[in-house]
Amino acid sequence: MRLRVAALGRIKSGPERTLVDDYLDRGTATGRAIGLGPFAESEIDTRSLKSSSDESRALAAGLDPGARIVLLDERGKALNSRQLARQIGQWRDEGCREAVFCIGGADGHDRSQLPQPDLMLSFGPAVFPHKLVRVMLAEQLYRAVSILAGTPYHRD
C-alpha cells in the first residue's frame, strides 16, 4: 500500500526538506518487505488559490478513488504511534492500494470540498508551522511502518 503526503505549497531546500525526504526514504525502505510503500509526497501549487475552499478543491483533485483519506485537523483524533501503525496495517490488510494524508492550509480544510475522510488526525491542540507538520507527519509514518516491521526504532 502506497503512503502519500498531500500538502499545500512547496518546501524549498533546507532542514525541513532534508528531514521530510529522509523519513519518506526510510519509510519506503522499511515498508517494502511488509507491503507498505513507496512513500510519496504531492506538493500543490498554491499561487492561484485564494481561499480554504480553493485549497481543499485542489487537494481533492489529486485524490484517487478508493484511496483512504486522512485529514490532518486540530479537531481530529490524537492517536499514539502504535494506534496509527495499527490503522495503517489494517488498511493494508484490507487490500487498500493507497492512503493519502492531507495537510491543509493555514485556515484548515473546507470539508464541503473534500470527500468524507476515513480518519481525521490531530497532533494535538497546539498550532504548528506547516513545514514542521510535514516533518512530524513523515516521521510518524516512518515510525508506524517501523512498528509494523518490528524494527527497534520505536520504544514504548
Curated annotation (Swiss-Prot):
Q: What's the superkingdom here?
A: Bacteria
Under catalytic activity, the entry for this protein gives: pseudouridine(1915) in 23S rRNA + S-adenosyl-L-methionine = N(3)-methylpseudouridine(1915) in 23S rRNA + S-adenosyl-L-homocysteine + H(+)
CDD domains in alphabetical order: RlmH-like (cd18081)
Going by the UniProt record, its keywords in alphabetical order are: Cytoplasm, Methyltransferase, rRNA processing, S-adenosyl-L-methionine, Transferase
- Supply the Gene3D superfamilies for this chain: 3.40.1280.10
Q: Where does S-adenosyl-L-methionine bind?
A: 72, 104
- InterPro entries membership: Alpha/beta_knot_MTases, RlmH-like, tRNA_m1G_MTases_N
UniProt cross-references to Pfam families, sorted A to Z: SPOUT_MTase
Q: What class of enzyme is it?
A: transferase
A molecular function (GO) held by this record is: rRNA (pseudouridine-N3-)-methyltransferase activity
Signal peptide as annotated in the record: none
What are the annotated GO cellular component locations? cytoplasm
Q: What is its EC number?
A: 2.1.1.177
Q: Chief localization class?
A: cytoplasm
Report the SUPFAM superfamilies cross-referenced here: alpha/beta knot
Q: PANTHER family, per this entry?
A: METHYLTRANSFERASE (PTHR33603), RIBOSOMAL RNA LARGE SUBUNIT METHYLTRANSFERASE H (PTHR33603:SF1)
What's the subunit arrangement here? Homodimer.
Q: Which NCBIfam families match?
A: PRK00103.2-3
The record's listing under HAMAP family reads:
23SrRNA_methyltr_H
Q: What family does the Swiss-Prot or TrEMBL record give for this protein?
A: Belongs to the RNA methyltransferase RlmH family.
Give the protein name, as stated in the record: Ribosomal RNA large subunit methyltransferase H
